């Protein structure tokens, strides 16, 4: 099954954006555009870039808009026009939204994943990542088959620096402060749908599929 829909997920860290995106990408043959993944890939390829943005990522701050905009725009240019995709983690600021509009990055639907702060902290404290392929796991929601080993390549799983409680709290505050104008814009456009991210991932995916 293939979809050509252009989709955006808005949600705080830990709302399930990445995991839900991966489920839909596999089922509907969509391209997953995650700013976090783009940053990590660029860091692994470019030591100068790594030095430039590592401090932003490790402190839970946003990477400057001009850097993020260029990475996302360059990636989208490579995608065929009839190919559907999911934007995960972009736009996060009003400036990024304005860049999107100016550069004709259009969307068919926007899903806002609503979640309580305490749930976010609980989920993120249980996240693990593969050091080699960057696949993510969650000991509450999406456990690895082998504890602390990646299902794909058996590499040791690690936690990320930005999943420490004090960094998580900062990231939540940053998200809440920046998301309001973005949500308001898409509300006026009539393409935003609100989802309860407190429910299971399976239940959330079923809701999303009603609009695909």
Swiss-Prot record:
It catalyses: AMP + ATP = 2 ADP. Belongs to the adenylate kinase family. It is an enzyme of class 2 (transferase). Residues 126-163 are annotated as: LID. This is Adenylate kinase. Zn(2+) binds at residues 130, 133, 150, 153. One of its GO terms (biological process) is AMP salvage. Monomer. AMP binds at residues 35, 40, 61-63, 89-92, 96, 160, 171. Residues 34-63 are annotated as: NMP. Disulfide bonds: none annotated. Catalyzes the reversible transfer of the terminal phosphate group between ATP and AMP. Plays an important role in cellular energy homeostasis and in adenine nucleotide metabolism. Consists of three domains, a large central CORE domain and two small peripheral domains, NMPbind and LID, which undergo movements during catalysis. The LID domain closes over the site of phosphoryl transfer upon ATP binding. Assembling and dissambling the active center during each catalytic cycle provides an effective means to prevent ATP hydrolysis. Some bacteria have evolved a zinc-coordinating structure that stabilizes the LID domain. It is found in: Cytoplasm. GO terms for cellular component: cytoplasm. The gene is adk. One of its GO terms (molecular function) is ATP binding. Its EC number is 2.7.4.3. The keyword Transferase applies. ATP binds at residues 14-19, 127, 136-137, 199. It comes from the Bacteria. Pathway: Purine metabolism; AMP biosynthesis via salvage pathway; AMP from ADP: step 1/1. The lineage of its organism: Bacteria, Bacillati, Mycoplasmatota, Mycoplasmoidales, Metamycoplasmataceae. InterPro entries: Adenyl_kin_sub, Adenylat/UMP-CMP_kin, Adenylat_kinase_CS, Adenylate_kinase_lid-dom, ADK_active_lid_dom_sf, P-loop_NTPase.
